[in-house]
Amino acid sequence: MQERYDFKAIEAKWQKKWEELKLYEVDDFSEKPKYYCLEMFPYPSGKLHMGHVRNYSIGDVVARYKRMRGYAVLHPMGWDAFGLPAENAAIKHGNVHPADWTWDNIANMRRQLKELGISYDWRREIATCHPEYYRWTQWLFLQFYKKGLAYKKKAPVNWCPGCQTVLANEQVIDGECERCHSRVEKKELEQWFFKITAYAERLLQDIKKLTGWPEKVKIMQENWIGRSEGAEITFKIKGHEETISVFTTRPDTIFGVTYMVLAPEHPLVEKISRGTQYEKDVLEFKRKMMYLSEIERTAETAEKEGVFTGAYAINPFTGEEIPILLANYVLVEYGTGAVMGVPAHDQRDFLFAKKYNLPIKVVITPPGQELKAEELTEAYTGEGILVNSGEFTGLANKEAIRIITQEAEKRGFGKYRVNYRLRDWLISRQRYWGAPIPVLYCEKCGIVPVPEDQLPVVLPYNVEFRPTGESPLKYVPEFLNATCPECGGPATRETDTMDTFICSSWYYYRYTSPRDKQQPWSKEKVERWLPVDQYIGGVEHAILHLLYSRFFTKVLYDLGLVHVDEPFTNLLTQGMVLKDGAKMSKSKGNVVSPEEIVEKYGADTARLFILFAAPPERDLEWSDQGVEGSFRFLNRVWRLIYQTKDRISDELREFSAKDKELNRLLHATIKKVTEDIEERFNFNTAISAIMELVNGLYQYKEGEINPGLLKEALNKLVILLAPFAPHIAEELWEALGNKQSVHLEKWPEYDEEALITEEVEIVIQVNGKVKDRVMVPRNAAEDELKEIALNTPKIKELTADKKIIKVIIVPEKLINIVVAG
């Protein structure tokens, strides 16, 4: 063992050895209990950033710890490799192909991950852009299609003019594209969708099964699904055969409806306004709305805008004619795209009615009060009693919701309905670098799924990527033109590619059988490994990726392809890595490169700092001093073992008081580190406990030592350090004379007996006020305690010349001396 901690040589040596020993390759059918530890796989951008290092270091501690606890640990890594950045790089640089760019990036990031010493089973590596992977993505699309869960329809979609493609609702943040921040527009296009709404209720109800998930993630999913109960009521349109259905959570206010508003995209808009004097205004309003995002149209602060269509609806309960308007705040994707206006009892309706001089009619009043429409300064939205409501007048409004819904059902113009905010998942993308949708179009046969034995539908290599708003694949004749498998006639291929979130919705199954050419996964292996025991990733995936993965798993369960209906038992969402209080980004100029840190201090220091600086779920503030501190600590551990390794042996002498204190500290540390990893993932406090043990060992080695105890303490120290700093732990383990890898060692158990100290500190009070503290034998008799307390110098002085009335003793806690005078 060298005197100097040469991290470069040590880390290279052990990474090579681990690979030679196949140390982290797991046997699918080991007799050990299974543990599936998974970090969200990255997009291969080319370089790891500190967020990656944090994510993978957290996962690696868990994986290494569980191996040492006797589990067969599946800990794989792969690449979420399709997506716009590869295409954008090709466009930007002009001479690089997305495939080449992606594979080069994968090679670089794989090297970086190996240099960090993350304990992956690299045999299982997958990349979603490999035909052997997306073949099964396409196969899964066909299973969804057969089950009626994949369909094509013309729909107003979110169009990003910057990326020149369609976005799912979840990819629009505050009216902007989450990737390039362009303002998102609305466009009518034929698109493919997955019918996630068919699973809305199950996705919502099963949130309660997710006991190992953070509360905030569960709440975000609940809100996104957005369940509401109410009634669907059908209104006739004066002079037209068509009807308009509205969904309302407040059927108790039906008698207060004074107008109706439609979304500008509602299919009846043009028909009901045709030939009226308002037609031109209606078409202009509709055109204007196409350029506004949902946020711009529906925000609380947004100006409520509308236009009269010239048509009237008929209230089915009262027979009253009410004007039909278009309004910016009504969206065709939500409910039915039509809303009944009740200005007296809905604030948004109230503001709209005031602006356009529409009537206001009070139909609910607080008990014992009267409300006058002309005196209202805002809508009354509280509980109350129905007024001006025909035969329902006098009912409490909560009761009226049920009764009016039943009455509407009885009369044939309404029904109870559950509505969801969740929309179907739009999966078409007009870009090249994605999995082709395995569908053909035949003039004779219509939509024809590609036969399974013709998969994969491979992406052609020679393609022009410049975005035109249409898929680049449209301009590749050898891809586009095909033969219909049903009639043998000419057919064309679907040229849109799939949303990359489809690829990442099932990847955790493929890790169980990454090279299987016959099926997406072996059922036997999935039954062995799934569900994922611990999933780790950023909270920014709370809705998109996690909801889609839950949806996929439920569909696969229904198809009999998997045995679980929830994919992830436990979820840890780690915080961001900040510098100067802001998220690291090139634009802010505050990026710290992991490669530079590894070069200067080593991977173990980088890992240790990032695990020590904050609990995993909190944001972490980068600190150069903190990195220096972690490096100094590892050097301190190195010196400790360098200075003591020749003083240890198997000779275990009888314990002195000093030995007992070290033994107690050792077992207290084992207990603390074990509980912090096992129960709380508080790696920062676990590392802190290891640091205290190192301090204790430095004190212990001065003077007389017990060679057997010191050997045990040093060995256990190295084992405790191993999940956090795996390379230095291996080197120190070898220096201590051990033969097999430290990562194959059994995790140490702590002895409760050893934790018991022989002395305890007790408080001494005089008349209830703390005056002194003293160490006493743990099981001292009351007479002995009384004598110790009365003879301490401080208490002697305070009780001199005073009459002691009584001495109250609370064992192992306090002694209270009650005196007079």
UniProtKB/Swiss-Prot annotation:
Query: What PANTHER family does the entry give?
Result: LEUCINE--TRNA LIGASE, MITOCHONDRIAL, LEUCYL-TRNA SYNTHETASE
Which is one GO molecular function term here? aminoacyl-tRNA deacylase activity
Source taxonomy: Bacteria, Bacillati, Bacillota, Clostridia, Thermoanaerobacterales
- GO BP term, pick one: leucyl-tRNA aminoacylation
Q: Is Signal found in the keyword set?
A: no
Protein name per the record: Leucine--tRNA ligase
Top-level class of the enzyme under EC nomenclature? ligase
InterPro entries linked to this entry: aa-tRNA-synth_I_CS (IPR001412), Leu-tRNA-ligase (IPR002302), Leu_tRNA-synth_edit (IPR025709), M/V/L/I-tRNA-synth_anticd-bd (IPR013155), Methionyl/Leucyl_tRNA_Synth (IPR015413), Rossmann-like_a/b/a_fold (IPR014729), tRNAsynth_Ia_anticodon-bd (IPR009080), Val/Leu/Ile-tRNA-synth_edit (IPR009008)
Against HAMAP family, the record matches this protein to: Leu_tRNA_synth_B (MF_00049_B)
Which SUPFAM superfamilies does this chain map to?
Answer: Anticodon-binding domain of a subclass of class I aminoacyl-tRNA synthetases, Nucleotidylyl transferase, ValRS/IleRS/LeuRS editing domain
- What Gene3D superfamilies is this protein classified in? 3.10.20.590, HUPs (3.40.50.620), Isoleucyl-tRNA Synthetase, Domain 1 (1.10.730.10)
Which NCBIfam families would you find in this protein's record?
leuS_bact (TIGR00396)
Residues annotated for ATP binding in this entry: K586
Origin organism is: Carboxydothermus hydrogenoformans (strain ATCC BAA-161 / DSM 6008 / Z-2901)
Q: Spell out the subcellular localization from the entry.
A: Cytoplasm
* Catalytically driven reaction(s): tRNA(Leu) + L-leucine + ATP = L-leucyl-tRNA(Leu) + AMP + diphosphate
Which family does the record claim for this protein?
Answer: Belongs to the class-I aminoacyl-tRNA synthetase family.
CC terms in the record's Gene Ontology section: cytosol
Keywords attached to this entry: Aminoacyl-tRNA synthetase, ATP-binding, Cytoplasm, Ligase, Nucleotide-binding, Protein biosynthesis
Name of encoding gene: leuS
Instruction: Give the EC number(s) listed in the UniProt record.
Output: 6.1.1.4
Motif 'HIGH' region located where? 42-52
* 'KMSKS' region, short sequence motif: residues: 583-587
